[in-house]
Amino acid sequence: MIELQNVGFAYNNKHTVFSNLNLYIDRGDIVSIVGNSGCGKTTLLNLIAGVLLPSKGEIKKSDKNIAYLMQDVTLLPYRTAWENTFLACELRGIPVDNIQKQAAKEILDLFNIETEALNKFPKELSGGMKQRIGLLQTLLTDASLFLLDEPFNAIDINALNSIKLYIWEYLIKSNKTMIFITHNIDQALLLSDRILIMRSPTKLLEIKPAKEYCSLSPDERI
């Protein structure tokens, strides 16, 4: 469970981003945040993650086991893609055993990551491949709450369909929560069951279920 109550935030106590934000996300929800650049999407994710602290109000989280995938995927340049796959687990002190490796291989197949790509170093990987490795890193942590900032924007539609199948099955079966940012409304409709449309830091429109987006007027859509 995540609850934001009358949350306000300003950078350097001058540039106000949020002044009175209220939001409730239940455990097991898959939520997308959609909006134009500069409307506060990443700031909202940083507040939920605890990277930033609100200047007023309160943020409640029932579970502190959070995995946060930022826009710039962390891949060590001297490690292969396969070795980088387990970086987040290592940083959390999670043993990289045969069970973890088998889980990684199963996800790799669904993500359409070829064995040849796993032997490459980050500088040899495409943007989409780096994103898939970063997403795999994050999912292997087995966190309760996944926060993802633009995780799919360089991933082709065929791979995205496979990722959707895995994410839905994995998250729903284990009752985990995912919140992700996207500029692409099609990705939001494909992957989430709730959509938060941010017109501005003060205007948040929630669509639940996501399929109701299609019934909005053109002025209400992104």
Annotate each language-model stretch with its function.
Residues 34-36:
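The feature captures the beta-strand-to-loop junction immediately N-terminal to the Walker
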Residues 49:
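Helix-to-loop junction immediately C-terminal to a conserved catalytic motif
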Residues 79-86:
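Short coil-to-helix segment of the ABC ATPase nucleotide-binding domain corresponding to the Q-loop/switch region
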Residues 99-116:
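Conserved ABC ATPase "signature" region
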Residues 121-125, 129:
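Conserved ABC ATPase signature
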Residues 141:
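Conserved signature/switch motifs of ABC ATPase nucleotide-binding domains
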Residues 146-150:
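Catalytic Walker B motif of ABC-type/P-loop ATPase nucleotide-binding domains
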Residues 175-181:
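Conserved H-loop
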